[in-house]
Amino acid sequence: SNPLNLVRFRNLVNLLCRRRLDNEHDIFIKFISWNSLYADFIHAAFPDVPTLFLYRDPVEVIASVFRETSAVLLARDSRQAEFLAGTTAIELAAMDDVAYLSSCYAHYFSVILDAQPQPKLLSFAAFAPDALEKILAAAFALQPDRHQLRQMHEQFSVYSKDDRNQTGFKDDSQSKHELLSDDHLRLAEQYCRGN
C-alpha cells in the first residue's frame, strides 16, 4: 500500500465504474474471495465506500471449487499459495487440496474480522429476495426504487454465473455437503471453526 498504487487502483476502479447513462448513480463492485486479503488496501483507496463481506459455508465453496476449478486451486503450486493460505511452503506441502482450500478460507475470514473498519458481514444463507431491501439499507444506506428492486429480485431466480440468464437458481447446499467425505468435512470445520 503506497500512494502510487492507491492512485492506480482508484483510477482503474473509476474507469470501470464510469457512468454510461444519466440515471446511473450507484455501482456495486464484487471482488473474488481472495481479494478480502486486500481489505485494508481497498479501504485506504476508498475510505468512504461501504463494504459488505458475503460469506458462505466453506464446505459449499470447496465443493464448488471441485466442480469448477477456480484460480485459488490453480495457484496451489505457486508462491502465491503461501499468501492465500497465510502459511508456509512447508506447511502447504503437507496439505491435501481440502486442507489447502480450508486454510485459504480461514485466512480470508481472519483478515476480514481484523479489518478496520470491519466490513458488514452477511451469510450467503441470509441473502434472499425478501431480505434484499433491508440488506441494502443496512450495508450501503441504499434504498432502491420499486423498478430497481424488481430488477434485483429477478436476478435471484437465475444462476449467478450464467451471463445469459437462462439457468434457474436452485439451492444446492445439501448436495455440496454430500460431495465431501466425512474426513474432509471435519478438516474444513477444523480450519474454519474459529471464524
For the regions a language model picked out, list residue spans one by one.
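PAPS-dependent sulfotransferase catalytic core
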Residues: S1-L12, R67-L101, H147-N195
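Active-site donor-binding segments of glycosyltransferases and PAPS-dependent sulfotransferases
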Residues: L15
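A general structural motif
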Residues: E24-D26, D48-V49
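Conserved two-lobed SF2 helicase motor
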Residues: D26-I32
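PAPS-dependent sulfotransferase catalytic domain
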Residues: S33-A126, E133-R146
